């Protein structure tokens, strides 16, 4: 495809126009009085949202240079959302302010590289101040307040606080559709996976069609259980104890399945067979998770273990196992706490190292099953559009609350940034264009607070002047229009969200300022209109 190239001011101006198109659309959503944006779809109902990253994803500009500028800001929003789950609009507003302030100085002859260094140094100092000023999350009410601000709904805040209180920081909180109006919260106790009994003959409770095993042995194998000899050997190990047995295998077929069913019907010993979850390497990893949770050892050819020659040391234990047609839950596995903690640490490391959203999600699910639990918030609303929008807000609020637990809280409403920048301004000592770069940050840092005030119908400049005179932690509560101690009022932001927004905005601003040429795809000429058919006259 042919390319078109622009240089210097002309290149940056085209990108700036695209940045402004996107940022001006997104920033109207900032703060408690922020507005919604309607996103048209090529099919189905339109989406109504105030989520910055969702809006940014939908914007695709026609001009190639504007499109590149918009894509750079989309990256700011996406990175902030990936790391913290919120703060996308704040990051976009900061990026716009930093780029505008920076380009003024580049146009007047400042060195872009020195400006970039100054921006980076000032941002690092502000982030350091934010982390030092953070207040740890100590109560369920603090989690509820943080989630309430993110979702804009006190009921959602309470549900999320209850869910995280139950499953812990490493637990998973998922959001699903509900066929009833309102919010419901369900918890999963123990490790649950999406595989049920292989045969309905294993059912022990006819009323709800489940098989419940109390204090069972657990056999885990990465291969198939097919021969009758395998079952006879396993039965000899278990029958003497009088305990039931759960078998988790790639499959149970051949002579093995009817042998197990027959023994169950005759009452010789109580057993349930289920297929192992997942495929390939993920299946191996999940079997190993189960082994560590229950104190078992996975029987596999790789380890030189055969079903017809194992002893009872490879069997795991649990307080209870509940198996339905579609899923299996292992409650209170007997694995060692030290082994479980080590496995949790390993999975955490894998999450940090992974650059795939899908892999991270699956690893997080495994982590939750080992370390915490799973809570499901079910969302119902009057219309599909409303349900979709509410579901999205709840997902963001969950990640926001987890970010607060992880790194602590700061006063919200853009106040923490302004006050941390005030402290940084006193300590950052730079010269020349680096000092100019730092000043760019100290001026641009006001943009989120200014935008929140303007979205609430107030004068941004007046609010900023007022906030600068207030004690640390006090500022504008845009929801009420009052100036107060924001921590006491429950107007807070997670440190992780605030610092990620600043770091990502500063990074993109630096790239913007140091751009000297833009190579874009040449737009395709419009196709000629089709010739009209001869009507035969």
Swiss-Prot record:
EC numbers: 5.6.1.7
Annotated GO MF terms: ATP binding; ATP-dependent protein folding chaperone; isomerase activity; unfolded protein binding
Subcellular localization: Cytoplasm
Keywords: ATP-binding, Chaperone, Cytoplasm, Isomerase, Nucleotide-binding
Record-listed ATP binding positions: 29-32, 86-90, 413, 477-479, 493
Record's catalysed reaction(s): ATP + H2O + a folded polypeptide = ADP + phosphate + an unfolded polypeptide
InterPro entries associated with the record: Chaperonin_Cpn60_CS (IPR018370), Cpn60/GroEL (IPR001844), Cpn60/GroEL/TCP-1 (IPR002423), GroEL-like_apical_dom_sf (IPR027409), GROEL-like_equatorial_sf (IPR027413), TCP-1-like_intermed_sf (IPR027410)
GO cellular component: cytoplasm
Matches recorded under Pfam families: Cpn60_TCP1 (PF00118)
Disulfide pairings: none
GO biological process terms, semicolon-separated: protein refolding
Family of this protein: Belongs to the chaperonin (HSP60) family.
Subunit and partners: Forms a cylinder of 14 subunits composed of two heptameric rings stacked back-to-back. Interacts with the co-chaperonin GroES.
Described purpose of this protein according to its UniProt entry: Together with its co-chaperonin GroES, plays an essential role in assisting protein folding. The GroEL-GroES system forms a nano-cage that allows encapsulation of the non-native substrate proteins and provides a physical environment optimized to promote and accelerate protein folding.
HAMAP family, A to Z: CH60
Protein name: Chaperonin GroEL
Species of origin: Parascardovia denticolens
Annotated gene: groEL
């Amino acid at each position: 495809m042919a390319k078109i190239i622009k240089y210097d001011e002309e290149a940056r101006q085209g990108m700036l126009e695209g940045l402004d198109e996107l940022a001006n659309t997104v920033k109207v959503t900032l703060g408690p009085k922020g507005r919604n944006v309607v996103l048209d779809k090529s099919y189905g109902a339109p989406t109504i949202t105030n989520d910055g990253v969702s809006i940014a994803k939908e914007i695709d500009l026609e001009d190639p240079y504007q499109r590149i500028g918009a894509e750079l800001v989309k990256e700011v929003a996406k990175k902030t959302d990936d790391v913290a789950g919120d703060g996308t609009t704040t990051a976009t507003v900061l990026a716009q302010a930093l780029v505008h302030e920076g380009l003024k100085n580049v146009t007047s002859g400042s060195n872009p590289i020195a400006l970039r260094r100054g921006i980076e140094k000032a941002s690092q100092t502000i982030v350091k101040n934010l982390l030092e000023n953070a207040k740890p999350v100590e109560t369920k009410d603090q989690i509820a307040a943080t989630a309430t601000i993110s979702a804009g709904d006190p009921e959602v805040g309470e549900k999320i606080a209850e869910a995280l209180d139950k499953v812990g920081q490493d637990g998973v909180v998922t959001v699903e559709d509900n066929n009833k109006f309102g919010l419901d919260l369900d918890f999963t106790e123990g490790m649950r996976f999406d595989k049920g009994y292989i045969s309905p003959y294993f059912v022990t409770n006819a009323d709800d069609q489940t098989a419940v095993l109390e204090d069972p042995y657990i056999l885990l194998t990465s291969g198939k259980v097919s021969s009758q000899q395998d079952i006879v050997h396993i039965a000899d190990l278990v029958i003497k104890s009088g305990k039931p047995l759960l078998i988790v295998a790639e499959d149970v077929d051949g002579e093995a399945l009817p042998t197990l069913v027959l023994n169950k019907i005759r009452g010789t010993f109580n057993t349930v067979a289920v297929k192992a979850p997942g495929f390939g390497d993920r299946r191996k990893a999940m079997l190993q998770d189960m082994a560590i949770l229950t104190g078992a050892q996975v029987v596999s050819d790789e380890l030189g273990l055969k079903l017809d020659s194992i002893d009872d040391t490879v069997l795991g234990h649990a307080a209870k196992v509940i198996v339905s047609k579609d899923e299996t839950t292992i409650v209170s596995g007997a694995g060692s706490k030290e082994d479980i903690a080590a496995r949790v640490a390993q999975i955490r490391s894998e999450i940090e190292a992974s650059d795939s959203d899908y892999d991270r999600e699956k690893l997080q699910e495994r982590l939750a099953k080992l370390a915490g639990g799973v809570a499901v918030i079910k969302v119902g609303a009057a219309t599909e559009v409303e349900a979709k929008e509410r579901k999205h807000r709840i997902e963001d609020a969950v990640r926001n609350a987890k970010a607060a637990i992880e790194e602590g809280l700061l006063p919200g409403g853009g106040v923490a940034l302004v006050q941390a920048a005030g402290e940084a301004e006193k300590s950052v000592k730079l010269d020349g264009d680096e000092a100019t770069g730092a000043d760019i940050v100290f001026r641009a840092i006001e943009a989120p607070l200014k935008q929140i005030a303007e979205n609430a119908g107030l004068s941004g400049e007046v609010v900023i002047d007022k906030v600068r005179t207030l004690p640390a932690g006090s500022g504008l509560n845009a929801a009420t229009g009052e100036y107060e101690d924001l921590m006491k009022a429950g107007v807070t932001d997670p440190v992780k969200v605030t610092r990620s927004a600043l770091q990502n905005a500063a990074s993109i601003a630096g790239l913007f300022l140091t751009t000297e040429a833009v190579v874009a795809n040449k737009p395709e000429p419009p196709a000629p209109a089709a010739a009209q058919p001869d009507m035969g006259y």
